[in-house]
Amino acid sequence: MSEMTPREIVHELNRHIIGQDNAKRSVAIALRNRWRRMQLEESLRVEVSPKNILMIGPTGVGKTEIARRLAKLANAPFIKVEATKFTEVGYVGKEVETIIRDLTDVAIKMTHQQAMEKVQYRAEEQAEERILDALLPPARDAWGQNEQSTEDTTSSNTRQIFRKKLREGKLDDKEIEVDVAAPQMGVEIMSPPGMEEMTNQLQGMFQNLAGDTKKKRKMKIKDAFKALTEEEAAKLVNQEELKESAIFNAENNGIVFIDEIDKICKRGDSSGPDVSREGVQRDLLPLIEGSTVSTKHGMVKTDHILFITSGAFQVAKPSDLIPELQGRLPIRVELEALSAHDFKRILTEPKASLTEQYIALMKTEDVGIEFTEDGINQIADAAWRVNETTENIGARRLHTVMERLMDEISFDATDRAGSKLVIDEAYVISKLGELVEDEDLSRFIL
């Protein structure tokens, strides 16, 4: 898991997300606390439970982006889900326990990748030997036994010459015939919603029945080296230890991000069973509080999994969540709506900002694009004004405005190869001015 300090985490998030300092601080502290807990003695570690977070803020201000960037920084099992995808147990739809099963699958994949990297060098050595055996098969006598001859030294020298060529890549395109593991037959099983776990078990059973079979294949040496390295690495990895390590990682370092949690708040005017709202909240309770979930890899405890939830809460309020769930989300963070100044910063400051992306895209057609400061100010102001007069969709409005602004340039780029275009205030007004001023047009076009 990540050993970054809260300050380093916030600094990294600042490279991609503008503003929202409180939210960044909260997730940075929560992530660092995961590391701190793992440094404690076993007796105290089991008593320290994570402080789950509820992020509240309008759409398009960076809630989901914080989760996306956090996933890359965490270096721990991480999964993002939409609360609206689930229904109460016993009804058609996904059950909340699939969250933990998916998290465990992510942990297995992560741990497997790390284990493969550890044995990569040894696997490459063994793959190299197998390729050399295919290139220089040992001489055999009439009874099929390897011949012992005085030419062993010569053979060894030849092998070293081929080894050198192989490492230098001079034999990459040469074809050889090697024994590789035959691809496992995939068995597609159509299952009703909520029965995914049973389907996975059936698929695994059918694959195990097929067993490990070898197949002679003719392939280029560079492709054979990759296939044989993966095969040898898989042999060197202990699958049982890998599974135990992955489950431990999921239980102690796992992070679950639940988006759109405001959409499962009960509405006051509804009547009858609310299987996709309050029912889901009640099913989430034991997961967040701490329970044991059965997965195909083994039993997984959720006591120390960190849950980060977020919602716009434009119709509902955080107090509309059932009281028990509110109590399980002790840290509340409010994200602020974005201003025109924030929009300007979003267009220029983040790594791979929108303006950078369009400049790079047009460069592929040999068209130079330059955004002037007054042009960027005008784009930011246009996006902010449309948000104010119509529906406020936050930073996502910039994508719509930029697409409209760049529409003509993108279409004619192939005819403008070698030219340079300056996007200044006058150009932006000529393309967007009428749309921004006319509220009815803004509603339908921007």
Swiss-Prot record:
GO CC terms, sorted: HslUV protease complex
SUPFAM superfamilies: P-loop containing nucleoside triphosphate hydrolases (SSF52540)
Matching InterPro entries: AAA+_ATPase (IPR003593), ATP-dep_Clp_protease_ClpX (IPR050052), ATPase_AAA_core (IPR003959), Clp_ATPase_C (IPR019489), HslU (IPR004491), P-loop_NTPase (IPR027417)
Keywords: ATP-binding, Chaperone, Cytoplasm, Nucleotide-binding
Subcellular location: Cytoplasm
Molecular-function GO terms, alphabetical: ATP binding; ATP hydrolysis activity; peptidase activity; proteasome-activating activity
Pfam families assigned: AAA, AAA_2
Binding-site residues for ATP, renumbered to this chain: 18, 60-65, 259, 324, 396
Source taxon at top rank: Bacteria
An example Gene Ontology biological process: protein unfolding
Family: Belongs to the ClpX chaperone family. HslU subfamily.
Assembly, per entry: A double ring-shaped homohexamer of HslV is capped on each side by a ring-shaped HslU homohexamer. The assembly of the HslU/HslV complex is dependent on binding of ATP.
Job of this protein: ATPase subunit of a proteasome-like degradation complex; this subunit has chaperone activity. The binding of ATP and its subsequent hydrolysis by HslU are essential for unfolding of protein substrates subsequently hydrolyzed by HslV. HslU recognizes the N-terminal part of its protein substrates and unfolds these before they are guided to HslV for hydrolysis.
This protein's name: ATP-dependent protease ATPase subunit HslU
Source organism per UniProt: Vibrio atlanticus (strain LGP32)
Gene it is expressed from: hslU
